[in-house]
């Protein structure tokens, strides 16, 4: 009978660790506007007691909810596990490509306007999937 280890070294982690239990999260499209998805994502993480690093990405605002923002994904430190993408669908393929370039391991897209919206949305979805595959980003 085998046992499951209670702790796992980073090199031995499941490929899904970055999505299911991230140690660090970038919020692309973070916002100081309470009506925006990027604000709600930040508030949710904070209120739920997330203990990892949160990196809000917003080139127009110096800080959101007391957390210093970064201007873009290129400014992230190495090793960020997950990106929450809170931007319009048209920007998502390029953002996923940037995640791959920066070594972000996983992404959750919090946007509509993909395959469910017709041919143009389906093309955007295909582009995002291709960018994820090329960059090794799990969606």
What kind of region is each of these model predictions?
Residues 1-138:
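Catalytic-core regions of core metabolic enzymes
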């Amino acid at each position: 009978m085998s046992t499951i280890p209670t702790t796992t070294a980073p090199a031995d982690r499941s490929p899904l660790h970055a999505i299911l239990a991230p140690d660090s999260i970038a919020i692309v499209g973070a916002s100081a506007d309470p009506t925006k998805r990027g604000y709600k994502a930040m508030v949710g993480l904070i209120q739920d007691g997330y203990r990892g690093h949160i990196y809000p990405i917003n080139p127009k605002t110096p800080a959101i909810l007391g957390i210093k923002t970064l201007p873009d994904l290129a400014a992230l430190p190495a090793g960020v596990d997950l990106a929450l993408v809170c931007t319009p669908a048209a920007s998502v393929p390029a953002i996923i490509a940037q995640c791959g370039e920066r070594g972000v391991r996983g992404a959750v897209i919090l946007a509509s306007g993909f395959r469910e919206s017709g041919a143009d949305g389906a093309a955007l979805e295909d582009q995002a999937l291709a960018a994820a595959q090329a960059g090794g980003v799990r969606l």
